[in-house]
Amino acid sequence: MDNSYKIKVQHVTKEYDLYKSQAEKLRSFFSLSNSKVPHFWSLMGISLEVKAGETLGLIGVNGSGKSTLSNIISGIIPQTTGTVEVRGDTSIIAIGAGLRGNLTGLENIRLKALMQGLTNPEIDALMDDIVSFADIGDFLYQPVKSYSSGMKSRLGFSIAVHVNPDILIIDEALSVGDDTFYQKCVDKISEFKDEGKTIVFVSHSLKQIEILCDRVAWIHYGTLKEIGATETVVKHYREFTKWFKGQSKKEKKHFQRQMKANQKAFDIDAYQQQVIEERQANDPNDQNVAAEVKKDFYGSVISEKMSWGNRFLTIAVGIVFVLACLINVSGHSLGDVLQNPGNIVHPETVLHDTNATSGVK
């Protein structure tokens, strides 16, 4: 791997816990071990680079991890392990990505542009071009939740390409909409390519991939099956899909179950050890390989799972909050409660004898 990349992904994995219900998720929070919770690895050690000015296509079957990878690169979701280095501002285009359903199209344009770092005067200058490119008519003033998927794609694409990002990530955004808008999008992408923009293009349409992409990465059930010249990788992917379609219904289900089982059984520790051994073989004199690999795996990752220290702290804060509420409702002071904690649950009741006091003047 050279140093001319715009995007560098190294040893990236993504793990999800497969909770069957919210109750099971809550129980796991208080459990001493999460070994009983099934895990699913959407990505299992992806390493690749995207060069400056290159258009890289991502292909693969449904559920292979293409969108997961594009979301990690764009910073929408974090990776479980590995490093992601992006040299420049990214803008992702996916159906409805980043659009707020309760806001109008016009309000979403301003919000997304502000989030990309544009000022209000800059947005005002671009507004007519964005509106014209999206071409959604009076729906511009309606809440986005009333839009069709094609209209959401139009609006999202128009916003993304007009904020002038360094890196454009397009995730199935051209799969909806009419031919006229599709051609406008292709022309805009071609214009970006001519300007030397870096593009990651996710699509199920191999024709789109062949037209737009310089290289292609085939993501296959969480792994990088192949990366290389568009013609070569697309040819191999077509051979795979032809083979798969030729299987019986039973054989297809068996193949898919086996692939999903591999993703559930993936061992991150074994993968880490494999990387260590490969590096040691390449450089036997390096005594710090294990530490370097650990840093590559976890050095830039913020854990999505709570440590036990944080769990205990959260529980303690929750208990203190509940006690504070009970003290407030009971009407007693903190000192009274500390002397007689039972007052919180069974507050003392003082009975007054109205007959005894009625004659006092």
Curated annotation (Swiss-Prot):
Binding site residues for ATP: G60, V61, N62, G63, S64, G65, K66, S67
Do the record's keywords include ATP-binding? yes
Under catalytic activity, the entry for this protein gives:
ATP + H2O + teichoic acidSide 1 = ADP + phosphate + teichoic acidSide 2
Please give an example of a GO cellular component term from this record.
plasma membrane
* UniProt xrefs under InterPro entries: AAA+_ATPase (IPR003593), ABC_transporter-like_ATP-bd (IPR003439), ABC_transporter-like_CS (IPR017871), ABC_transpr_TagH-like (IPR015860), Bact_Polysacc_Export_ATP-bd (IPR050683), P-loop_NTPase (IPR027417)
Q: What is the topology of this protein in the membrane according to its UniProt annotation?
A: Peripheral membrane protein
Annotated ranges, domain ABC transporter:
13-246
Q: Which UniProt keywords apply?
A: ATP-binding, Cell membrane, Membrane, Nucleotide-binding, Translocase, Transport
Write out the GO MF terms. ABC-type teichoic acid transporter activity; ATP binding; ATP hydrolysis activity
SMART domains per UniProt? AAA
Known EC number(s)?
7.5.2.4
Q: Which Gene3D superfamilies match?
A: P-loop containing nucleotide triphosphate hydrolases
Describe the subunit structure.
The complex is composed of two ATP-binding proteins (TagH) and two transmembrane proteins (TagG).
Q: What does this protein do?
A: Part of the ABC transporter complex TagGH involved in teichoic acids export. Responsible for energy coupling to the transport system.
Which family would the database say this protein is a member of? Belongs to the ABC transporter superfamily. Teichoic acids exporter (TC 3.A.1.104.1) family.
Q: What is this protein called?
A: Teichoic acids export ATP-binding protein TagH
Taxonomic lineage from the root = Bacteria, Bacillati, Bacillota, Bacilli, Lactobacillales
